[in-house]
Amino acid sequence: MHFHFSKMHGLGNDFMVVDCITQNVFFSQDLIRRLADRHTGVGFDQLLVVEAPYDPETDFHYRIFNADGSEVEQCGNGARCFARFVRLKGLTNRYSISVSTKKGKMILDVEDDGEVTVNMGVPEFEPNKIPFKAKQKEKTYIMRAGDKTLFCGAVSMGNPHVVTVVDDVDTAEVETLGPLLESHERFPERVNAGFMQVVNRNHIRLRVYERGAGETQACGSGACGAVAVGILQGLLDENVKVSLPGGDLRISWQGPGKPLFMTGPATHVFDGQLSC
């Protein structure tokens, strides 16, 4: 099997992006794991696959696979790179691009400065829709992780997120608490774990331990989930700068029942081809 690909990143969250409209490519879980290896493969956090639309009202279907080969529902940084990729490769000349995903639809708007704004949809806080095991919906849940008691928010941005407020992200126990939360029994589909430091009502610092990928330089849906939880808990206003290890995103949300918007860069690194 021979195919062309692009390497891209959104604030250091890096991707292998493949056009599966003009190329016939099949990715097994084993192949994805081998390609994701940073020593012997291409190396990436996620594989993004561009497919022809499943829905006639959309332009493309957008699939996301983690480095461990598991398919996931959402990737915000990937969505921005997806929009840049389909324009760079001449698959569309539109500036507003509609895509379907494993869990819904998204609108990707390419701005004049090259940044991309993504309508991430309406944040979902109902426990059974996250999914998260809880008796009822709460703004804050008490959870045990190892020997720690944590006060967390839970939300779905098309994929599940748990968010914990910390005093300082630099000293947060991401390496130990991240894996414990990712595989916590209360999240039957596993979860992305965010650790949020509130700088002020319009600025947070964030680190995210992504399910199936570990800690990444940036997580777009994680940034969205953190802001949604922060606004719901009364900690943040509706326009927030999110500072991640890889750089900054801008998030805007007017509150429950409203769609959330994320704006940030998408960078093309190089093109390549593989035979495997």
From Swiss-Prot:
Give the protein's biological function: Catalyzes the stereoinversion of LL-2,6-diaminopimelate (L,L-DAP) to meso-diaminopimelate (meso-DAP), a precursor of L-lysine and an essential component of the bacterial peptidoglycan.
Q: What is its EC number?
A: 5.1.1.7
What's this protein's name? Diaminopimelate epimerase
Where in the cell is the protein located? Cytoplasm
Q: Which organism is it from?
A: Vibrio campbellii (strain ATCC BAA-1116)
Per the similarity annotation, which family is this?
Belongs to the diaminopimelate epimerase family.
Q: Which GO molecular function annotations are given, in alphabetical order?
A: diaminopimelate epimerase activity
> Would the keyword Cytoplasm turn up in this protein's UniProt record?
yes
Q: Sorted alphabetically, which NCBIfam families does this protein's record hold?
A: DapF
- Give site residues, Could be important to modulate the pK values of the two catalytic cysteine residues: 161, 210
* Keywords for the protein's UniProt record, in alphabetical order: Amino-acid biosynthesis, Cytoplasm, Isomerase, Lysine biosynthesis
Entry's Gene Ontology BP terms: lysine biosynthetic process via diaminopimelate
Which residue stretches, if any, does this entry annotate as coiled coil? none
